[in-house]
Amino acid sequence: MSNIEQQVKKIIAEQLGVNEADVKNESSFQDDLGADSLDTVELVMALEEAFGCEIPDEDAEKITTVQLAIDYINAHNG
């Protein structure tokens, strides 16, 4: 597991109040982890802050799973 993947999963677990072991790559924020739209917005903001990047709203709407978040950060980080 990459460092970015570990960080993303940790942030997701903290933001959504779930056990980090329950955060799987294929997990949907809403369907599997119980996030609502506000949780998702706060999660995107936490990812932006942690990785020093800006995630435009149109991209944020497409980030619906843990793997999509990891892929986005990998593609846009640094």
UniProtKB/Swiss-Prot annotation:
Gene Ontology BP annotations: lipid A biosynthetic process
InterPro entries, per database record: ACP, ACP-like_sf, PP-bd_ACP, Ppantetheine_attach_site
GO CC, alphabetical: cytosol; membrane
Superkingdom per UniProt: Bacteria
Domain Carrier: 2-77
Record pathway: Lipid metabolism; fatty acid biosynthesis
Record-annotated membrane-spanning stretches: none
Modification sites for O-(pantetheine 4'-phosphoryl)serine: 37
Main location: cytoplasm
Function: Carrier of the growing fatty acid chain in fatty acid biosynthesis.
Sequence similarity: Belongs to the acyl carrier protein (ACP) family.
Name by which UniProt lists this protein: Acyl carrier protein
Organism annotation: Neisseria gonorrhoeae (strain ATCC 700825 / FA 1090)
Gene: acpP
